[in-house]
Amino acid sequence: NGVTSIAMESTGTYWQNLFSTLVGQGFDVILVNGRQTKNIKGKKTDIKDCQWIQKLHSLGLLSASFLPDSDTDTVRTYSRHRQNLLKQSASCTRRMQKYLRLMNMRLEVVVRDIVGLTGSCIIEAFLNGEHKGEELAKLRHYNCRKSEEEIAKALQFNGRKDYLFALKQEWDSYKHLKQQIMDTDLQIDRLLKEFIEKDEHKK
C-alpha cells in the first residue's frame, strides 16, 4: 500500500536474510540499533514493538546503523570465521598442555610455545610412540634456550594411556584447525585481490 521505506531492528543475526530480501525487492530499509527503539511504557509484545518502530520511523527519529558494502561484508564474514577458528585453536592448545602435564610431560616449562618448532616436533614424535625424554630432547630446535638435558628431565612420561589418547585427539583437532585457518587466509587473500582488480582506485 505505497510503502517504500521500512525500519527494522538489528537483533542478532536474524535480521540479515529479511534485510537482504527487502532490499532486493527495492525497499529503502533502515537498520536501527535496539537502543533507539526501546519503548519503556507498557508490556512488550512483537506487535507493539513494530507499531512503536513504525511511529518513530514516520517521525524521522531513527538513524540508520552503518552497513558495509557487499564486498566489505563478505571479507568481514571470513574474518570473523577466522577469529573463531583461532579461538578454537587456542583452546586446543590449552587442553594439550593440560594433558601433557598430567602425563608428567612438562613441555611448557622448557619451551615458550608447545606448538612452536620444538614443541610440535616433540608432540608428534611422542604420539608416534617415542616416550623417552632423552630421545625426544634430541628434537630440540637449535634456537631453543633450554639444553637437551633440561628438556629430557622435563619429559618423564608416567604411562597414562588415557591422557595419551586425549592428547592425540586434541593434536588432530589442532592440526585440522590450523589447516582451516590457512584455507581461510587463502580465501581472504583471493577475495581482496579480486576486489582490488575490480576497482582501479584501490590499486
In which residue ranges do the predicted regions lie?
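A detector of single, family-specific signature residues
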Residues: 1-203
